[in-house]
């Protein structure tokens, strides 16, 4: 039976030649998936699964380490002596799962003053990770960021604009993009019961804030996507060769709601599991306006992305700090 979630081979886009016939056909498939579903799986993405598996091992080792080790990276809300506010570790007492939020690992204490955003933080990973693990996390962040840029440039091509405008929206170190590890322990009870269909959930129904989310889910799965028309829920099947992509509120805004953010949730499961999403989010000082994709001239009006993000995060309990 054909899956509700389409699978797209994006290898024609990897050489940055967006004008070839194969690349144009691939971009059209992405456009259709974004409009019809808001979710799709990608293969041929160029990221080695040895790298992904290694990153997952690093995440699992961290979550299975001592509470003291994890709390070294917890935000100030939970550990008063810590300086970080936005990034870091949050315990499962918050919303039924543990998490670790990492920003761009290129950020160093010496250059923090350059960035006028509370969301740009230096997180000292040496407190909880060894140097090889930190290097692996940094490399993966860079690789998944580059992959996200390729997908976004594909969207830009749909609007017949120069793909270089991507640099106006996304700048390393200024980006608020987040590499997150979600760790679902042996949950003794669901986070909530769906009001729509009574299903027990391990993660509440929500949409994401950024342009794209690129997710790796382990074979235990549990992710479901809602059909916007009939409101039914569909499983996202596990594919060990694929990464899962979904549209977020920032892309919905920039595209004038052509590409809508899609509701998704995670089913309650007593088995331990982990997912690794990457939230591709613009630079904090990028001015969000629909003319970025749709207009021929730049417009001074708009909302800075960090303010857009602040409004979006209000619905997530783990960010109520």
Locations of the language-model features?
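Peripheral, non-catalytic segments flanking oxidoreductase cores
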Residues: 1-321
């Amino acid at each position: 039976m054909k899956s509700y979630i389409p699978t797209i081979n994006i290898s024609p886009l990897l050489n940055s030649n967006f004008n070839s016939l194969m690349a144009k056909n691939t971009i059209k498939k992405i456009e259709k998936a974004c409009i019809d579903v808001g979710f799709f799986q990608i293969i041929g993405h160029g990221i080695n699964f040895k790298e992904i598996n290694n990153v997952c091992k690093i995440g699992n080792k961290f979550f299975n380490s001592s509470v003291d080790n994890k709390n070294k990276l917890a935000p100030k809300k939970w550990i008063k002596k810590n300086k970080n506010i936005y990034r870091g570790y949050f315990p499962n007492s918050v919303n039924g799962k543990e998490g670790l939020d990492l920003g761009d690992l290129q950020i160093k204490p010496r250059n923090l003053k350059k960035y006028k955003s509370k969301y740009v933080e230096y997180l000292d990973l040496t407190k909880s990770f060894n140097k090889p693990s930190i290097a692996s996390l940094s490399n993966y962040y860079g690789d998944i960021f580059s992959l996200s840029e390729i997908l976004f440039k594909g969207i830009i091509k749909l609007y017949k604009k120069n793909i270089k405008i991507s640099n106006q929206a996304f700048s390393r170190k200024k980006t608020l993009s987040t590499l997150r590890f979600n760790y679902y322990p042996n949950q003794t009870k669901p986070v909530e019961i769906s009001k729509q269909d009574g299903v027990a959930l391990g993660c509440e129904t929500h949409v994401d804030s950024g342009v794209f989310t690129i997710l790796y889910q382990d074979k235990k799965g549990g992710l479901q996507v809602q059909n916007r028309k009939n409101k039914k829920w569909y499983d996202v099947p596990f594919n060990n060769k694929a990464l899962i992509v979904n549209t977020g509120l920032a892309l919905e805004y920039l595209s004038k709601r052509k590409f809508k953010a899609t509701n998704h949730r995670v089913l309650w499961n007593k088995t331990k599991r982990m997912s690794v999403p990457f939230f591709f989010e613009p630079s904090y000082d990028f001015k969000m306006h629909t003319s970025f994709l749709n207009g021929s001239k730049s417009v001074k009006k708009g909302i800075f992305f960090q303010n857009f993000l602040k409004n979006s995060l209000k619905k997530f309990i783990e960010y109520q700090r």
